[in-house]
Amino acid sequence: MSDEITNGAAKPTEAISGPTFTIEKIYIKDVSFEAPNSPAVFNEAGQPELQLNLNQRVQRLNENAFELVLHVTLTCTAAGKTAYVVEVQQAGVFGLFGLDQHAIGVLLGTQCPNILFPYVRSLVSDLIQIGGFPPFYLQPINFDALYAETLRQRAQNEKEGSQISSHPAGNA
């Protein structure tokens, strides 16, 4: 009798058939914290202003592997001076097997950033606190809505581009 317990998942040596999504690796690609006006900025009164910039980049590594990098820059200013700048590039390598292009696009545009975002949130918060500033927590981001908006804009741009090219340059 075997002491091995299985939960119905495929054993590593068994071939997995059908569409498959795997997380191969999650890692920090780049991280930076700058507080150029400390310690003077700690005494600034007033409400700080925050500017968040978020984007993602996808690179195909091979037929079934993709690297997604979630890049976040958070800049805090107080009384017109930069209090801090946090920059994080959190990356992951994801395996996408047996999926069509549409499904790959959806996973890379929604599921992969949703997997990476908690790592970004934690790292940004920790860096800010270690830097001597009050905690800041990145609020949840609806990557599904962002992906849908990107598709809508892309379709609109293609539609406008085809309308422009379908009109003659001039009439004689």
Curated annotation (Swiss-Prot):
GO terms for molecular function: unfolded protein binding. Pfam families: SecB. GO terms for cellular component: cytoplasm. It is found in: Cytoplasm. Gene3D superfamilies: SecB-like. Its main location: cytoplasm. One of its GO terms (biological process) is protein tetramerization. The keyword Magnesium does not apply. SUPFAM superfamilies: SecB-like (SSF54611). It comes from the Bacteria. Keywords: Chaperone, Cytoplasm, Protein transport, Translocation, Transport. Homotetramer, a dimer of dimers. One homotetramer interacts with 1 SecA dimer. One of the proteins required for the normal export of preproteins out of the cell cytoplasm. It is a molecular chaperone that binds to a subset of precursor proteins, maintaining them in a translocation-competent state. It also specifically binds to its receptor SecA. PANTHER family: PROTEIN-EXPORT PROTEIN SECB (PTHR36918:SF1), PTHR36918. Belongs to the SecB family. This is Protein-export protein SecB. It comes from Xylella fastidiosa (strain 9a5c).
